[in-house]
Regions:
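N-terminal low-complexity, acidic/polar interaction/targeting segments
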Residues: 1-224
Length: 224
């Protein structure tokens, strides 16, 4: 769930991989299966350059123009390919880890896939010491009540007990625990980091788990 933290140079452009059911967050890792020829070309392009792909959410009505230029939410998460498997028939399996939020401000033509022109998404980030209450609240969620003793809660509590920042931990929690896609996209786009964390806390608190809860960890592979 949690890779080594780092600061990344912002890429002003990246291939776009739009899907209707995935919202990637920084630090989160998603398993993907690439089978469409245009996205096989996207993978080859990414691997030949900086191994970056911008995950975008398709907007309602995308079905009408899926093979053309369907509408996307302009807030995306740029991810880096951690590893990949190129299958004999041209398909790919890969793990993509989110790095940064970005805004799509334009697109470049000339490829069978879409390439986004990007600018950094603005964020107001408090000092870590100012988020102590939010971090404590997050840890309490996974140590008490319905989440206690679940496998994913143990992973997340261990994560919160380490050196990961509270905003990064909250992003991981949102990616792994929330199912509401519009809510997740709204959280990805939320520029006020404290408010984002508080909204994630509220959303996770409102989840009602079945008894017993079937583990959703590790996450399943998603296909294009």
């Amino acid at each position: 769930m949690d890779a080594t933290p780092g600061q990344y140079d912002f890429a002003p452009a990246a291939p776009l991989f739009p899907l209707p059911n995935i919202v990637l967050f920084p630090r989160a890792v998603v398993a993907l299966h690439i089978f469409e020829s245009r996205y096989q070309a996207m993978m080859a392009h990414a691997l030949a350059h900086d191994s970056l792909i911008a995950m975008a959410l398709l907007l309602p009505g995308w079905e009408k123009d899926y093979y053309g230029h369907p509408p996307i939410d302009p807030v995306v998460c740029v991810g880096a390919i951690l590893n990949h498997e190129h299958l004999p028939d041209g398909r790919y399996n890969l793990l993509l880890q989110g790095r940064v939020r970005a805004h799509v401000v334009g697109e470049r033509a000339g490829h069978p896939f879409r390439i986004a022109q990007l600018t950094p998404a603005p964020e107001s980030i408090p000092e870590e010491s100012d988020l102590a209450n939010e971090r404590t609240h997050l840890r309490e969620i996974f140590r008490h009540g319905q989440w206690r003793n679940t496998e994913i809660a143990r992973h997340l509590d261990k994560c919160l007990g380490g050196t990961i920042s509270t905003p990064d931990a909250a992003d991981l929690i949102a990616f792994n625990l929330l199912d509401d896609i519009p809510l997740k996209q709204s959280l990805l786009a939320e520029p006020d980091v404290r408010r984002r964390i508080q909204r994630i806390i509220a959303a996770v608190t409102e989840i009602h788990l079945p008894t017993p809860r079937r583990s959703n960890w590790p996450p399943k592979t998603s296909s294009n």
